[in-house]
Amino acid sequence: EIILLFLIEGYALDIIKFGIERRADGPGIDIGRQVSNAIKLLAVNIAYYLIPAIIIFVLGLFLRDWILTIISIILLIVFALANFMARCRLAKTDSLSDALAVGEAIGDISKVGIGKLIATVILVVIIAIVIMILAGIIGSINDLVGDILFGIALVYLIFFYHRAIGLLYSNV
C-alpha cells in the first residue's frame, strides 16, 4: 500500500513536470523514477511543514492565545504555498536542493502571483468537491458503480490538480 502511494506521488510529480513543459501527453510509468521522486517529495513535505511547526512551537513558549493563532495560520499558509512551489521546482529541475531552497520557493509565490495561486487552489478544490459529490450521489444508487466511479474520479482529480499546478508554474 505504501509503495502504491509512493508511485502515485511520484507520478504526480511527473504530471507537474509535463504541465510546466506544457506537454499535451501524459507521463509514462517508470516505477524506479517515481518511487525516487516520491521519496524526494516526502523530504520536501517534511521540511516545509517541520519549519513552521518548530517556529510555532518556539513562539508558543512566549506568545499566547489569539496572536499565536494568527501567526500560526499565516505561517502555515505561506509554507503550504511555498510547498506548492517547491514541488514545481523539484519537478522542473529534479534537484532536491532546489526544492529545499525555502527562500527561493517563497520568492516563486510572488512570481506566479499569490492571487493566481490561491484562486487556482480554490477553483481546483471546488471542482474536486463537485466531482466527488456527483460520484457520491451515483455511488449511493449502486455501490459497485460508485466505487468504480470514485476510483476513476480520484485518478482524474490527481491528474487535474497536479497539471494545474504545473501549468501555473510554467511561466516562472
Give residue spans per PLM region.
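Juxtamembrane "helix exit" motif at the C-terminal ends of alpha-helical transmembrane segments
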Residues: 52-64, 130-142
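Selected alpha-helical membrane-embedding segments in polytopic membrane proteins
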Residues: 3-61
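Interfacial aromatic "cap" segments that immediately flank transmembrane helices
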Residues: 29-54, 81-133, 169
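Selective recognition of hydrophobic, aromatic-rich stretches within alpha-helical transmembrane segments
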Residues: 1-20, 63-99, 138-172
